[in-house]
Amino acid sequence: MVISMEMKNVNVGLFGHIDHGKTQLAKQLTEIASTSALDKPKESQKRGITIDLGFSSFTLDRYRITLVDAPGHSELIRTAIGAGNIIDAALLVVDAKEGPKTQTGEHLLVLDLLNIPTIVVINKIDIANDEEIKRTEMFMKQILNSTINLKNSKIIKISAKTGEGIGELKKELKNLLDSLDIKRDINSYLKMPIDHAFKIKGVGTVVTGTIHKGKVEVGDNLRILPINHEVKVKSIQCFKQDVSIAYAGDRVGMALMGVEPESLFRGCILTSEDTKLKVVDKFIAKVKILELFKYNLAPKMKVHINIGLLTVPATIIPYKIEKINDKEEPIILEEIKGGDSCYCIFKLEERVVVDEGDKILIMRLDLPPTTLRICGFGEVIDFGEVEVKKIVVKEGKVVKKKDKIYIEGLASSKTAGEKLIGGKVYIPDKNIWGVIKGTFGTKGALIAEFDEEVNGGEKVVLKRVRKWG
């Protein structure tokens, strides 16, 4: 294949329920065989890398397209989500006869949350009747209308077996790619998640992946995280052609010196020495829980976090920022439910490579595959420590003596009362605020000043924070 400098590399995902025809569609479109075909399942099991993402490629006008075939089986949803993190657009394949299934909806939700431009491909029109095709098209239109970002997605009807409709699909895919403003960060440090690793006789260790950011040249000294191996690039291939340099967005294979394939696993990332990537076992993310998620999440609950190509078990600690006594405090949330937005600390069961701004998906993989297992989504904002607190509410009452206002019931002694001086209190029935100015006597009575007139006997509330957990 002649490679023109004007050609643009893009990555297109193939999604859909098992047996709806994704792989057959890939064969219709493909010009270059799958990268993973070089890897044998027995070898992959020995290395701990499951061969469950298929990669192949073809050209379309000015685009060199890498197809990423995501698994459709319910047990491999984590891998399908991983595929969503390395693509620019997607084809969602639906069986015309069977219609959308559970994994169809799950995959569409992933694409919607990651905001991946998508074409719905209704396949197997050669074996479905007109009524079945119309019904499937109607169902898909209804589902698309319920999405956030994919309401205007095109629906194309094809037969991957006979080739009917493939020309129209290619035309629509080109139109979609033409409409995208794909930005590649080629001036950053290198970030390339490794999805396959194997040995080739006479070449040595070869890794494949899609470059997220930066560039790589033959001869570069790089680092593999989280194992912290130093390696050197011997050669680079892009679309089966030897190249001396590759950029963000390119799907590449690289021969490396300094590492054996047995040392690598999904979650390893190839990066440059100037990297800002972190290897962590916890991070903070800004999170949104899906309206459709029917279960509540509570502190210290076990979830699964997808980040890049990796899905790892984690403990969730949700919190909000609340102003208490003029100071913003991280306050624990005892539960979060569908539609809620908050901050979360995620404590991971293994160390992972994370970039600030990385998108995450939160899942409950312990739930049955017939129900929605994706809880929500978020963005990594920090790796620092946050001491989450809880609010302690105390109640007292107003006592008026002559021209003085006192509060009783918030403290049991003068010493305890002195610790409350400066604290803000309020009358909940009237939303009147006041400040504790001092103590009175030895039994914990407090002197207070309020913004407005208050009456004796009214309930007074004091909020304070304590360390949680």
UniProtKB/Swiss-Prot annotation:
SUPFAM superfamilies annotated for this entry? Answer: EF-Tu/eEF-1alpha/eIF2-gamma C-terminal domain, P-loop containing nucleoside triphosphate hydrolases, Translation proteins
Region described as G1: spans on this chain: 16-23
Q: Which UniProt keywords apply?
A: Cytoplasm, GTP-binding, Nucleotide-binding, Protein biosynthesis
Q: A GO CC term? A: cytoplasm
Chain spans, region G5:
159-161
Q: Does the keyword Cytoplasm apply?
A: yes
What is any one GO biological process for this UniProt entry? selenocysteine incorporation
Renumbered to this chain, region (G4) spans 123-126
Give the principal location in a single coarse category: cytoplasm
What NCBIfam families does the record tag this protein with?
A: selB, small_GTP
> What's this protein's name?
Selenocysteine-specific elongation factor
- According to its UniProt record, where is this protein located? Cytoplasm
Q: Which Pfam families match?
A: aSelB_III, GTP_EFTU, GTP_EFTU_D2
What are the recorded GO MF terms, alphabetically? GTP binding; GTPase activity; RNA binding; translation elongation factor activity
Q: Region (G2) spans which residues?
A: 48-52
Q: Which family does it belong to?
A: Belongs to the TRAFAC class translation factor GTPase superfamily. Classic translation factor GTPase family. SelB subfamily.
